[in-house]
Amino acid sequence: AIDPALAPAYGLAVLDALEAAGHEAWFVGGWVRDALRGAPAHDVDVCTDAPWEESERALVAAGITVHETGTAHGTVTAVVEGKPVEVTTYRVDGAYTDHRRPDSVTFVTDVREDLARRDFTVNAMAWHPRRGLVDPFDGAGDLERRLIRAVGVASERFEEDALRLLRAVRFACRLGFAVEEATQEALVEAAPTLGDVAQERIGAELRGIMASGRAAWAMRAEREVMLAAVPELAAMVGFDQR
């Protein structure tokens, strides 16, 4: 369980503002994952059943500055004490024809539907200081098992956004986790699709892998993905690419 004392005041201010206006809101994603590990991040993301226009209205009414940062996907950014808090309406994603972003999103009213669109089980949890944890895919169990596991069918998650291949490796590196078996099979199979991902997106994930101190592990354990991301690495690892 997460100690409510770990929740930062700037995040709670956003929850309170939304709930005061009659909406439901949760902390979601990376903050929840890291707080369960006892190492909460500074970045707080909030999801809510409020449409973004109503989120903005509720936050502004509470004296919070709001920037319209991604309204097509239901996202605004609240700034409290100089800290940005992303606030996103619960949504499900349509088809990803460009393997990067959904062509369309549908806003929904159940947080569980929102969690189902996320990449890995450890990132698909929501938490509230009074209502506790919502964890439909046993992300907390995978944290204990030290596993990176795709939500639902792994191949579908990677087909939606090929960058998730590198995100899986980066999270495994950063957390010191293994990749779950079915997820690993899907990673290897989908590796060639990384060729379609923009270099700057790949670069950002690779920097995270390097910063983790486990890049050598990534080259050994996730060779197919790493070589698909950076074909030039093949020469360094003495890998016969015939």
Question: What residues fall within each predicted segment?
Answer:
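Catalytic cores of the polymerase beta-like nucleotidyltransferase superfamily
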Residues: 1-242
